[in-house]
Amino acid sequence: MNKQSIRDIDVKGKRVFCRVDFNVPLKDGVIQDETRIQAALPTIKHLLDGGAKLVLASHLGRPKGEKKPEFSLAPVAKRLAELLGKDVPLVEEAYGPVAEEAVANLSEGDVVVLENVRFYPGETKNDPELAKGFAALADVYVNDAFGAAHRAHASTEGIAHHVDTAVAGLLMEKELEVLGKALSNPDRPFTAIIGGSKVADKIGVIDHLLDIVDTLIIGGGLSYTFSKALGHEVGTSLLEEDKLDLARQFMKKAEDKGVKFLMPVDCVITKEFGEETYVGPVDIDSIPADHMGLDIGPKTVELYADAIRESKLVVWNGPMGVFELDKYANGTKGVAQALADSDAYSIIGGGDSAAAAAKFGLADKMSHISTGGGASLEFMEGKKLPGVEALNDK
């Protein structure tokens, strides 16, 4: 990683504005999954142990620039206090006189949580005035919110231009090192597994990965567009007619580059979306006109598991089927199990793939689960992330 991190600086006695990702799911004010809070703890503890006056900032949900109590970070501040064993007050504003006074009263090793940065319309617009308001609370800026690094917002990008010292937190540093090495200097054989529902969402990542990987595996709803491009009938399965030519181009590129391009050989079909009309697996060229595929079949799972076993590095982004419904979860579960059992270094690209690994109790068997869905996807497309670019170079 060519950016400075908190390991490179002294924070003793300094006001440190740390942008974390506390965007946790809440139900009736109760945190449903605290993975993101846990992921931020090493950075928080490092800064507190170093004697920082710590100011934590995050978004939660999409309040759209209005102060809505259901999007308050109060439950997060409360949980953080329990995890750290110390007071963690919530400041009712994220900038301005109230916030400035709260920060001025901090001693070394103290921490506060600012209220949701998306309560202000200027956050998502990267308003320079709001960015300056945040910067007024800081001697040092730390970005540890990899999950929001692909967005140029006031608290993720704008603030960095108004603070002399802008560095990465430990989580951000790890994400950039793991994903960066995978893309620039991968262990081989290198396999990428791309699933999810739409080709449109994965165009950039498929295109970029075809320049790097040894094997590309396709699954999920987007695989039916590739099947159709090969001349198979896909019934009522998800199909993007306007992406058929692109699918053919990708397969041609794989051939030209000598990349093994694996696609489903069978799939699990149903007459209607749901478990009531479940039929079972059929070969990929035998989908009836009035049926749809909702998961990869057992032969495909075996094919993909073989490829995973032969790999030294595997990046997985996107499920193989509608894993939320048990009858269409076996494909995703099979791939997750193959990854868990393999010796390969496995990188799970956030979002649905991470949720699937957790659902099947296999998360702790994966080498690295990215905390950023959209951010890891854009990084794997070879794009620059605004929240990273704004940090100080080493």
Curated annotation (Swiss-Prot):
Annotated GO MF terms: ADP binding; ATP binding; phosphoglycerate kinase activity
Sites where the protein binds ATP: K202, G293, E324, G350, G351, D352, S353
Swiss-Prot/TrEMBL GO biological process terms: gluconeogenesis; glycolytic process
Matches recorded under InterPro entries: Phosphoglycerate_kinase (IPR001576), Phosphoglycerate_kinase_CS (IPR015911), Phosphoglycerate_kinase_N (IPR015824), Phosphoglycerate_kinase_sf (IPR036043)
Domain of life according to the entry: Bacteria
UniProt pathway: Carbohydrate degradation; glycolysis; pyruvate from D-glyceraldehyde 3-phosphate: step 2/5
Annotated positions binding substrate: D21, F22, N23, R36, H59, L60, G61, R62, R118, R151
Gene3D superfamilies: Phosphoglycerate kinase, N-terminal domain
Catalytic activity reported: (2R)-3-phosphoglycerate + ATP = (2R)-3-phospho-glyceroyl phosphate + ADP
UniProt keyword list: ATP-binding, Cytoplasm, Glycolysis, Kinase, Nucleotide-binding, Transferase
Chief location of this protein within or outside the cell: cytoplasm
SUPFAM superfamilies attached to this UniProt entry: Phosphoglycerate kinase
EC number per UniProt: 2.7.2.3
Location(s), subcellular: Cytoplasm
The protein's enzyme class: transferase
A single GO cellular-component term on record: cytosol
Keyword Transferase: yes
Family: Belongs to the phosphoglycerate kinase family.
Subunit structure: Monomer.
PANTHER family per the UniProt record, alphabetical: PHOSPHOGLYCERATE KINASE (PTHR11406), PHOSPHOGLYCERATE KINASE 1, CHLOROPLASTIC-RELATED (PTHR11406:SF23)
Protein name: Phosphoglycerate kinase
